Each structure stands twice: as C-alpha cells, then as structure tokens.
Design a protein with these regions (language model features):
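Nucleotide-sugar donor phosphate/pyrophosphate-binding loop at the beta->alpha transition
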Residues: 11-12, 22-46, 62
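Donor nucleotide-sugar binding/catalytic pocket of nucleotide-sugar-dependent glycosyltransferases
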Residues: 40-90, 102
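Conserved donor-binding/catalytic core segment of Leloir-type glycosyltransferases
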Residues: 82, 93-110, 115-120, 131-134
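Glycosyltransferase donor-sugar binding loop
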Residues: 103, 130-144, 160
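Aromatic "clamp/platform" in nucleotide-sugar-dependent glycosyltransferases that forms part
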Residues: 163, 182
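Short hydrophobic beta-strand element within catalytic cores of glycosyltransferases
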Residues: 199-202, 212
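Conserved acidic donor-binding segment of nucleotide-sugar-dependent glycosyltransferases
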Residues: 214-215, 219-226, 235-240
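A short, well-ordered alpha-helix in the C-terminal region of glycosyltransferases
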Residues: 228, 235, 242-257, 263-266
Length: 273
C-alpha cells in the first residue's frame, strides 16, 4: 500500500502494521530465514516514504526500531488494534455448560496444537466440557495437516466447525475464548469475544498480552505452555462465577478501549484528518 501510494504520487502516506506473521515467528532458519530477510528489506524501502506509521502493539514498534526497519526520523504511534463494533458484537448470555472456543487459521503459530493438547488433558477430568475450533487449513508452511486435525476430531478432543463467515453464533455458544498464539498485531477474534462478554485465555505474547489483564478479564499463559493453558481452563471450569465476572470486564474493556469508532477517531486525529 505504501509503495502504491508513493508510485501514485501521494504526498501524505501512512502505514498500519497489523501483525508480522510467519516470517517473524519461530527460529529464523531455512525458508523462514529467507522470507524474513526479504520482508525486512521491503519494509525498510516502503516505510521510508511514509509520514507516520501505526502499530497495533508496542512490541512490534520496538522491533521495527531495533531492526532499523523504520528510520528514526519517521514518527510512529501505537493504536488499539483495528477495533471492534461493540453494537454488532453485542453482549450475549453465557451458555449453561462450560465450553471453549478458538477461531484461527489452522497454523502452528496460532497455538492450535497447544489448544488441542490442552483440550485432551482437560477432558480427562471433565469429559463433558466442549472444545470447539473454527478455521480452515492454510497453504502456509506452518499449517496444521489434515491428518492432525482428523486425529483430534477422532479422539474427541475437538469439535471442528470449519470456516464460518459469521462467528457470532460460535462465540455466543462458548463460555471462554482461547487464543494461544505465538504473536499477533492485535487479535481481532479476541476483541470480538470480549465485546460479546467472554473471558479470554491468551498468551503473554506481543499483541495478545495487551487484551487481557491477568486475573481480571481472563488469564495470560506462556507461549507453547500446554500445562499452564490447561490449568487456566480448569480454573474457569471450576469457578463459573469468575467466568461471568471476567466476561463483564471484557465487555467493559471492549467498550472503553477497543470500540472501533474510538480507534478510528484516534487514528484520524494523528493523521490530521
């Protein structure tokens, strides 16, 4: 987008970095190392022609400065993700029985494997608890295989719902939303679940940690820590009143911090529009 604006002669150019993706997660070896080097060069070139760059979390902003992907002379701002329409994603009542949900592309760095492994552990103690997965298999090098997905379904660990054009019914049918991602910009699905009044379990990782105040509207767990993830799930199964209280705080945070109209207004102000 920045390159197109420059080639088109646009004078006031702005960029929004929404997340860093496959090339910036995991160890930089093989294809990932090559992609990372290429993408970094593209960022250096394209962002050098912007008036202002927006980031969705402070970790990404710091990384771009550290790697010199963004010249010191170019200002940057951190915004609260892309926001969520709190009217469209309205508060909904909790289901009567505990259930968990993950919505994601079926990639390793989204924490899909950890979610399935934690589900299997929890179901040993609580066999009636439901773990649903919404998403699709991607052609990304980090993609979950069809065989893995089939094994989780056959074992009864996961209920797979496929790709949904509207996720609101799926969120309404869960009591807790889970995203064990390795890195995000600001995860939109978490914001949607928060707006609908759901407690959240996510990772203490860039982009994810900003959405949860640990112990207030959910829990933060270390990246790739299946044990901590399953323990947090069990805490919420055993304390339904906490699920309701955390969900109410999530809704409050969505209204106060992540309302799309507030986010857009803040960005337009920074852009001088």
């Amino acid at each position: 987008g920045s390159l197109a604006a420059w080639l088109g002669g646009g004078r006031n150019r702005f960029a929004l970095i929404t997340g860093l993706g496959y090339a910036f997660t995991g160890e930089a070896t093989g294809l990932r190392k090559l992609l990372r080097a290429l993408i970094q060069q593209l960022y250096r070139f394209s962002l050098s022609r912007n008036r202002l760059v927006f980031f969705q979390n402070p970790d990404d902003e710091a990384l771009f400065r550290q790697l010199n992907l963004l010249k010191p002379a170019i200002p940057s701002r951190v915004v609260n993700g892309s926001g969520v329409d709190v009217a469209e994603y309205a508060l909904s009542p909790l289901p009567e029985t505990p259930s968990f949900l993950l919505i994601a592309r079926l990639l390793g760095d989204k924490g899909v494997r950890e979610y399935a492994q934690a589900a299997a552990l929890v179901k040993q103690r609580f066999p009636d608890v439901t773990f649903r997965l919404v998403g699709w298999i991607d052609d990304n090098p980090d993609a979950i295989s069809q065989a893995e997905l089939d094994a989780w379904i056959a074992a009864g660990s996961i209920e797979f719902m496929g790709k949904l054009s509207d996720v609101r019914a799926a969120i309404a049918n869960c009591s807790v939303y889970v995203l064990p991602s390795y890195r995000e910009g600001t995860p939109r699905t978490v914001l949607e679940a928060m707006a609908m009044g759901r407690a959240v379990i996510t990772t203490d990782a860039p982009g994810c940690r900003e959405t949860v105040v640990d112990g207030r509207n959910g829990y933060l767990v270390p990246v790739q820590d299946v044990s901590a993830l399953s323990e947090s799930m069990i805490k919420l199964i055993e304390n339904p009143e906490q699920v309701a209280a955390m969900g109410a705080r999530s809704r409050q945070m969505a209204e106060e911090k992540y309302d799309v109209h507030k986010v857009n207004k803040a960005m337009l102000k920074e852009m001088g529009l």
